[in-house]
Amino acid sequence: MEKSTLLSAVLKHRDALASVAEFLRILAGICWTLNYFSMLRTSQKDKIPSTGIFPLCNDIGWEFIYAFIYPKASAHWEGGVRVWFLVHCIVIFFIIKNAHNEWDYFPLIQRNLYFLYGIVTIGFAIGQYSFAREVGPDLGFFYGGVLCQTLASLGPIAQILSRNSTRGASLLLRAVATFGGFIKLTIYYLTGNAAGPWFESPMCKFYIGLTLILDFTYPICYYVIRRQELVNDEGDKKKKTKSGKAA
């Protein structure tokens, strides 16, 4: 398959774009770090998890495999994956600390949250490792990251809809995660990683389209639910006012 005109131009001027890629790498690192600390802040503020179990555990599993088992596949991030793995280990501790508030109706899960999060993380790590063995670390790093990004985009939508509440949700968190994700894709393109299928690949186009749709759907869901919460709060205030007058 012939390479696209855009890809050919990028490869031709790769050296000139190296500084751009380096700047984007730093910017992406800042965005993802802000995303993780925003998770901590939101979870501590609302006392419930700010992210779902599957996105979080899959991220940690992917980061562990490509930070310590296949570090060469993530070498273009210059140690960033290891930093994110360590930060995620802090995040998951605070998430589990507040997760019991969501499981009052299921005591068995509530009593075994550390085991649950641990076994799911190990399961995803084994899956990521198996996939890397199957297709190679370079391609595994890319498509394993695709799964991370897809779950990171889908999970918050499922979470906010199932809760029917904006508690534990944050528009800032989603904004920096979305921005960081697409900076990451741009870096892959500029660095010309040989394993990357990039924009001429139907699968890559599907991934970009899917995550864009999901990321633009989230603020709509947030706005609709938040507006309903404000309406309900206003109704409760009026009821209290009437009750006070009647008394």
Swiss-Prot record:
Q: Do you know which Pfam families this protein is assigned to?
A: Pyr4-TMTC (PF25129)
Could you tell me which InterPro entries the record lists for this protein?
PaxB-like
Which cellular component terms (GO) are annotated to the entry? membrane
Name the EC number(s): 4.2.3.-
GO annotation (BP), single:
terpenoid biosynthetic process
Supply one GO molecular-function term. Answer: lyase activity
Bilayer-spanning residue ranges: 20-40, 51-71, 76-96, 112-132, 141-161, 179-199, 205-225
How does the UniProt record describe the way this protein sits in the membrane?
Multi-pass membrane protein
Q: Please state the protein's primary subcellular location.
A: membrane
* Record's protein name: Terpene cyclase adrI
Specify the species. Penicillium rubens (strain ATCC 28089 / DSM 1075 / NRRL 1951 / Wisconsin 54-1255)
Recite the lineage of the species.
Eukaryota, Fungi, Dikarya, Ascomycota, Pezizomycotina
This protein's encoding gene: adrI
